[in-house]
Amino acid sequence: MFVQKKKSAWLNQFVQCAVFAAWACAPAVASADQFGVQVAGGVADHDIKKADLGVAWDPNWTWWEIGGFHFTVVGEAHVSYWRSTDDAAVHPNIFEVGITPVIRFIRSSGTIRPFIEAGVGIRLLSHTRITDTFSVGSAFQFADMVGVGAIFGTHQNYQAGLRFQHLSNGGIKEPNPGINFSQLYLEYNF
């Protein structure tokens, strides 16, 4: 009973901190050149499903114009929820929070602007042990990501993409098996 109350109190504090961080960052994001809200869903090995809510900031930095395409950088902040459907799950509900700078190679103009992207960010997890036989070692994780997608619409307000994400603690602590997510995401840009 005491352990359950402690978990509930920790979860409540985690959610309050995430809401406060989003509220505190809102003015900075709102004054940016362009920002967006992203929702994603994904699946991973070890019977884990992931729901993700993100905020993206595009400072409109461009360089290396090549054949109608150019490079750009986008900053993203994420809060995610993992759900393990494994019967042996010790912590079936895990929260993740983190940031990722993303480099894109994107079409420079058009109603539909395809891109490829890659990024390396950091994440913090609420729990490190998912089942008795699977643990990610530490709450601190690196998040490597590659993906494809497109920005579209008359005002370039919409974005959709597919990403492959690998989380690992980079050998900081054992065990370090890593975990791989395949994710679909949608974004609305303001």
Language model: regions and residue ranges:
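Extracellular loop and loop/strand-boundary signature of outer-membrane beta-barrel proteins
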Residues: 40-41, 86-90, 130-136, 169-174
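Outer-membrane beta-barrel "beta-signal"
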Residues: 51-55, 178-190
